[in-house]
């Protein structure tokens, strides 16, 4: 039972292969900063603010986030480009896959001279007990992974997207402090974090949007009309991921219909989470080329 749970959970949260980002240097523990001046409307002010663990997945993940914050990863000043990216890990709005979809991504960005800011966005409450949490995931994750109950995840995105918008405001307001260009603040998200990225990219106030966006194997989000001035979007997914047809493809179609710039990569294999040893591992190369083409 435990093995089945871990396989399903790891697939849904989309842990990025450990070897993929091995070129990134290990960094010291990052500075963690709350992004709201006060608890946002609707936020649970109970303690603890979040729960940190490695149980079950045998890698770092966070759950029960009640108040949003960011981890700050700044590159070496000698290679800094002035670009920053807010990173939104996945985890079905139940947890955040901090290692594969957060820390390694930040380190890889730093290697390229880009500042990384891992967003701890608000999540659905789960059992405090690790054992009970794993039982919850055994029940809840499979129908989300196969798409049969994916509609239930949409409402959970609302507070997380609000945190995404606030994260853009927060980082942009401190651009000078972190030696960033305020018009070079991007956002990248994985799975549920892709939904946060897409929702943030379409917020009503254009000043609160990221300047460029990337969504990897995004969950489905009803985006409606996409304006022509929406941020340029890099999207990637795998053909053998059941969520690609209802997540990534409609999002890209909406970007195209609105006349906003978008680049799509569909890899033949990789499933939900870009499994190791598949052609989806090339996404970092494709994303690097996309960034370079935009002088980022």
Residue ranges of model-derived segments:
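Bacterial N-terminal signal peptides
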Residues: 8-24
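Acidic beta-to-alpha connecting loop that harbors the catalytic carboxylate
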Residues: 39, 239-242, 269-271
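Serine-hydrolase catalytic machinery in alpha/beta-hydrolase-like enzymes
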Residues: 39-49, 53-62, 66-69, 76-81, ...
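C-terminal catalytic histidine-bearing segment of alpha/beta-hydrolase fold enzymes
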Residues: 134, 258-296
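Primarily recognizes the serine-hydrolase "nucleophile elbow" in alpha/beta-hydrolase
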Residues: 156-230
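Short beta-strand/loop motif that positions the catalytic acidic residue
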Residues: 234-237
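Conserved alpha/beta-hydrolase "acid-adjacent" motif
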Residues: 242-248
């Amino acid at each position: 039972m435990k093995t089945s749970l871990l396989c399903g959970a790891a697939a849904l949260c989309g842990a990025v292969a450990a070897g993929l980002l091995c070129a990134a240097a290990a960094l010291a523990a990052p500075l963690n900063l709350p992004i709201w001046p006060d608890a946002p409307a609707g936020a649970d002010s109970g303690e603890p603010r979040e729960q940190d663990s490695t149980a079950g997945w045998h890698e770092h993940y966070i759950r029960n986030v009640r108040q949003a914050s960011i981890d700050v990863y700044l590159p070496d000043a000698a290679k800094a480009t002035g670009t920053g990216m807010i990173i939104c890990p996945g985890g079905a709005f139940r947890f955040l896959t901090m290692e594969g979809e957060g820390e390694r991504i930040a380190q890889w960005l730093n290697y390229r001279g880009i500042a990384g800011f891992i967003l701890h966005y608000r999540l659905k409450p789960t059992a405090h007990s690790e054992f009970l949490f794993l039982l919850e995931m055994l029940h809840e994750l499979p129908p989300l992974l196969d798409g049969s109950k994916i509609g239930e995840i949409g409402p959970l995105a609302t507070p997380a997207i609000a945190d995404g918008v606030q994260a853009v405001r927060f980082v942009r307001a401190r651009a000078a402090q972190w030696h960033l260009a305020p018009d070079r603040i991007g956002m990248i998200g994985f799975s549920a974090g892709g939904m946060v990225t897409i929702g943030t990219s379409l917020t009503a106030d254009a000043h609160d949007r990221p300047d460029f966006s990337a969504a990897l194997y995004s969950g489905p989000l009803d985006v409606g009309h996409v304006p022509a001035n929406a941020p340029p979007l890099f999207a990637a997914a795998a053909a053998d991921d059941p969520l690609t047809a209802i997540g990534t493809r409609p999002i890209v179609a909406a970007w195209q219909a609105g006349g906003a710039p978008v680049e799509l990569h569909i890899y033949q294999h990789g499933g939900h989470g870009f499994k190791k040893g598949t052609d989806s591992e090339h996404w970092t190369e494709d994303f690097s080329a996309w960034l370079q083409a935009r002088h980022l």
